UniProtKB/Swiss-Prot annotation:
One of its GO terms (biological process) is photosynthesis. PROSITE patterns: CPCD_LIKE (PS51441). Keywords: Antenna complex, Membrane, Photosynthesis, Phycobilisome, Thylakoid. The gene is apcC. This is Phycobilisome 7.8 kDa linker polypeptide, allophycocyanin-associated, core. SUPFAM superfamilies: Allophycocyanin linker chain (domain) (SSF54580). Rod linker protein, associated with allophycocyanin. Linker polypeptides determine the state of aggregation and the location of the disk-shaped phycobiliprotein units within the phycobilisome and modulate their spectroscopic properties in order to mediate a directed and optimal energy transfer. Belongs to the phycobilisome linker protein family.
Length: 68
């Protein structure tokens, strides 16, 4: 069992709809290994996103986080 963080974040993604720009937020939840947490955090912040929730989780990467 690896030490993982269950991260829920919100990242703005820009989509073009008939010349006007609409801002659309994308929410996602993923398991991030303990060692890669800082890099993941930087990536989300750089994209202008917001980290909503962080929980400690145990398990394997690649499993559906909706089932945890």
């Amino acid at each position: 069992m690896a030490r993982l963080f269950k991260v829920t974040a919100c990242v703005p993604s820009q989509t073009r709809i008939r010349t006007q720009r609409e801002l659309q937020n994308t929410y996602f939840t993923k398991l991030v290994p303990f060692e890669n947490w800082f890099r993941e955090q930087q990536r989300i912040m750089k994209m202008g996103g917001k980290i909503v929730k962080v929980e400690l989780a145990t398990g394997k990467q690649g499993t559906n986080t909706g089932l945890l």
